[in-house]
Amino acid sequence: MAMGAVCDPFHPDLAGKTLDIMRAVASFLGNPTQFSTKMPIGPELAKEIPRGLPVSPLVTIITLEKAGELEPKAPGPEERLKTISILRKEGLKPMLFLRPLIPGLVEDELDDLISEAKHHGAVGVVVGALRVSRPILRRLSKIGLDGPIRARLKKEPPVGGLVPVPSRDLKEMAMRVAREKGLLAFKAACCANAYVAGVPCADLCWARGFCSNCPNKCLEKLPPVEEKAVREALEKAFGLEAREVSLEGLRLLVEVRARQGMEKLLDKARRALEVATRRLVSLRVVRA
């Protein structure tokens, strides 16, 4: 479970609701739960974070020097670094969320930023690329950061659309620096969440060529796959009848009987099975 993709879960107007949700998850589900935030979290608020479920805190800091220009309305990096310290003192495993990596900025700040995060108690770093639109590029041009980004783009972003900025070298650099400083390094937030919970990554990064090679060792923690459970899940959740179920290495192969209107269900069913079984899933439709 990830909190923070749409809005900051610890914004003062939302913190109470966020804690209510986390308590409910702790009481009834126990899902590994991750949140990303830029908000200051003080000792009293940190103590309210439920301990009955694995919690992976990500604290977003992308710059120390240009925070006032890039994020004028957000709390400064000093407050966020203090949040890392407080969360660590409460027994959690906070990580620096270094996303997005901004070309032309991160190269000069990377060493200091990761050093500060470690000094304040971060156990790892999660990296991620920048995505830009035309309006974002215009805003970045006002502080002289659009040039290095445009140099990496093959063409102008489409009207109304976002495009990822190629950043493989920056990701590798950030992960290398983090490891050199004794921190864990993750290519994706889901990997950090899985590491904290001690479970295989739900996005199957280890099977899709996106593994961070962290100490979690997902392959050693894969759950057993029972044919009966697969059949029941498809029937009860999606109304699909499994004709054949087989496991070949890391891939689960399922033949499902064709029926009217099933096209919209197949992708959802495949994704649900992948999360449940932690295997790559191939669904093949067969006629009766």
Language-model features: where?
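C-terminal accessory extensions appended to soluble enzyme cores
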Residues: 140-288
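Conserved AdoMet/S-adenosylmethionine-binding subsite of the radical SAM
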Residues: 1-170
